[in-house]
Amino acid sequence: MSSNKIGNKLSLDKVDVKGKRVLIRVDYNVPLDKNNNITSTQRIDASIPTLEYCLKNGAKSIVLMSHLGRPDGLVKPEYSLKPVVKVLEDQLKRPIKFLSDCVGEQVEKECANPEEGTVILLENLRFHIEEEGSGVDAEGKKVKANPEKVKEFRESLTKLGDVYVNDAFGTAHRAHSSMVGINLPQKAAGFLMKKELEYFAKALESPSKPFLAILGGAKVSDKIKLIENLLYKVDEMIIGGGMAFTFKKFIDNKEIGSSLFEKTAEQITKDIIAKAAKNNVKLHFPVDYVIADKFDNDANIKTVTQDQGIPEGWMGLDCGPETIKENRDTISRAKTIVWNGPMGVFEKSNFEAGTKAAMDDVVNATTNGAITIIGGGDTATCAAKYNTEDKVSHVSTGGGASLELLEGKELPGVTALSDL
């Protein structure tokens, strides 16, 4: 199994790049407005240390490949990576050569023997159906890629470098051509990927105890694999957000009014409770709620305890002050914390107290020496909103990828890297 242990993969700092053409899979899937201006450069910024390391250590060239959006294997100009060029030029203080394709004879020629220190950005990988293996045709019908053509696509990409570096953790759960199909002798994690793998290895392979998972979000069924896998690793688990109501209803038969509720999840919730008991994992649920008579910031709002229950026509949209206190105690005990999913509807100011308090408590735990990891997606959005990205140990850049890692799944993009 060792080849899939995430903590022992080759990383860029162990590779001699001097005089080499370095082919780097980055994640430049950046948000664009309708005038094709980039609205957040965060993903580009995050790749710069990897690129600067290669240039500083004498790489002959850097060839950057990425996807942007979902063009489904068709060339769609609105998904061009061209807008990235200006941002990269500003950051790296050098010209960037942009190629209008990512494979083929012309691209291979441009990348074969470039001048020392050249940085090349390829056009969107997903303009070719061979990147993802499926897409749509001009009529919008779903089509699968021809395996022979996929092989050619991968061979053409492989010709563009001497060393392969993967820095696209956000796509690591996809077995796409640029993630698993590059056939070079050294396949290393870039610094962004390395940081992700190091922190998840710390939590999943050698956590300091007590280990706490904080899990939120709407549906139990979406998080079932995550909960089940973590029940074999953690000492305590806080279950909050919308999915807490399904547990409250089935396990304690509490009145939950019109709160989020999954009718089909009865067996799942009972199995989780049983598994937690068997594994000596202490589960924490909300004991009070902030409720509203409609899903709106200007709704009528009140706080109720779980024993009072939530009246019909009202819904729980955040946890209450008692729960916040209990969560604070639980968080302050932990030495390793993984957090995936908000505690309430944090996007609306009247229902963000539970999430904001948990964030403050996780920041305090970090200050006191705990390793704290925030999974991607909504929880990463919370960290950005509350300006805490540099106040916790690690905020993951990959929503889907971090979720699959925490679920115990293998990530194809990680498995494909060279072992140490």
Swiss-Prot record:
Binding-site residues, ATP: 218, 223, 242, 316, 347, 378-379
Cofactors, names only: Mg(2+)
Sequence positions that bind Mg(2+): 218, 222, 378
Family: Belongs to the phosphoglycerate kinase family.
Gene that encodes the chain: pgkA
Keyword vocabulary terms for this entry: ATP-binding, Calmodulin-binding, Cytoplasm, Glycolysis, Kinase, Magnesium, Metal-binding, Nucleotide-binding, Phosphoprotein, Transferase
Phosphotyrosine modification, residue list: 199
Family matches, as Pfam families: PGK
Amino acids binding AMP: 218-219, 223, 242, 316, 347
UniProt-annotated binding residues for (2R)-3-phosphoglycerate: 26-29, 42-43, 66-67, 69-70, 125-126, 173-174
Residue list for modification Phosphoserine: 206, 393
Compartment(s) where it occurs, according to its Swiss-Prot or TrEMBL record: Cytoplasm
Listed GO CC annotations: cytoplasm; cytosol; membrane raft; phagocytic vesicle
Protein name: Phosphoglycerate kinase
Entry's Gene Ontology BP terms: gluconeogenesis; glycolytic process
Record EC number: 2.7.2.3
